[in-house]
UniProtKB/Swiss-Prot annotation:
SUPFAM superfamilies: ThiG-like. This is Thiazole synthase. Catalyzes the rearrangement of 1-deoxy-D-xylulose 5-phosphate (DXP) to produce the thiazole phosphate moiety of thiamine. Sulfur is provided by the thiocarboxylate moiety of the carrier protein ThiS. In vitro, sulfur can be provided by H(2)S. Keywords: Cytoplasm, Schiff base, Thiamine biosynthesis, Transferase. HAMAP family: ThiG (MF_00443). 1-deoxy-D-xylulose 5-phosphate binds at G156, A182, G183, N204, T205. It comes from Salmonella paratyphi C (strain RKS4594). Homotetramer. Forms heterodimers with either ThiH or ThiS. PANTHER family: THIAZOLE SYNTHASE. The gene is thiG. GO terms for molecular function: thiazole synthase activity. It is found in: Cytoplasm. The keyword Signal does not apply. Its EC number is 2.8.1.10. The active site is at K95 (schiff-base intermediate with dxp).
Length: 256
């Protein structure tokens, strides 16, 4: 069970809604993933119509919506988008994204911290997408963010946990949930994140662009479950030296 702010989730896999070939395929993949929290880019939705091709099937699916501010380049733009989302969708939950460079889509740490502090004061449950910077994540926690979402690698790159060393520090020091976001390309990446101690992962591109998104969503669900179980089982310590699992000499002495 995962608790963030005022909500609890059975699934530790969060999903996105971008890049799917159709809304129907998107919903089928989300259902196969078991995800209960789904991100939604405000710039891709017609907030005036609840029969929007993306929004309507998500509402029908009964998932918790996490609108995001993707496309915002400044704190002011992100705050404005957040206020629109709260009014239109009736939710105070928000994934805060501010990335001014369209090529790399890396989050702006200064604008993110600035916006997060303001949005928390306005009553939002803020989940900020941020770089894998332990100091920044601690500052975001201190201003009241309900979780932190450090990247594993650039958005949509499928590179995996390139920031593993920093993620380990973030996880160790955090007192709010840590959701590894961006760069997760295959289910084994997700399993590794959960084994490391992350509370959840957010996956979009890896599922949406697969030849079979529904099958890939299922694979991610199973990988996240496996990673969580492995962590709870407490793996043995790594060792520099070999350690035999069977006697090396006893059987020879018995035959002598």
């Amino acid at each position: 069970m995962l608790r963030i702010a005022d909500k609890t989730f059975d699934s530790h896999l969060f999903t996105g809604t971008g890049k799917f070939a159709s809304s129907q395929l998107m919903v089928e993949a989300i259902r196969a993933s078991g995800s209960q929290l789904v991100t939604l880019a405000m710039k891709r939705v017609d907030l005036r119509q609840h029969n929007d091709a993306i929004l309507a099937p998500l509402i029908e699916a009964g998932v918790t919506l996490l609108p995001n501010t993707s496309g915002a380049k400044t704190a002011e733009e992100a705050i404005f988008a957040a206020q629109l989302a709260r009014e239109a969708l009736g939710t105070h939950w928000l994934k805060l994204e501010i990335h001014p460079d369209a090529r790399w889509l890396l989050p702006d740490p200064i604008e993110t911290l600035k916006a997060a502090e303001a949005l928390v004061k306005q009553g939002f449950v803020v989940l900020p997408y941020c770089g894998a910077d332990p100091v920044l994540c601690k500052r975001l926690e201190e201003v009241g963010c309900a979780a932190v979402m450090p990247l594993g690698a650039p958005i949509g790159s499928n590179q995996g946990l390139e920031t593993k060393a920093m993620l380990e520090i973030i996880i160790q020091q955090a007192t709010v949930p840590v959701v590894v976001d961006a760069g997760i390309g295959v289910p084994s990446h997700a399993a590794q994140a959960l084994e490391m101690g992350a509370d959840a992962v957010l996956v979009n591109t890896a599922i949406a662009v697969a030849d079979d998104p529904v099958m890939m969503a299922t694979a991610f669900r199973l990988a996240v479950e496996a990673g969580l179980l492995a962590r709870q089982a407490v793996p043995g310590n790594r060792s520099t030296y070999a350690s035999a699992t069977s006697p090396l000499t006893g059987f020879l002495e018995a035959l002598a």
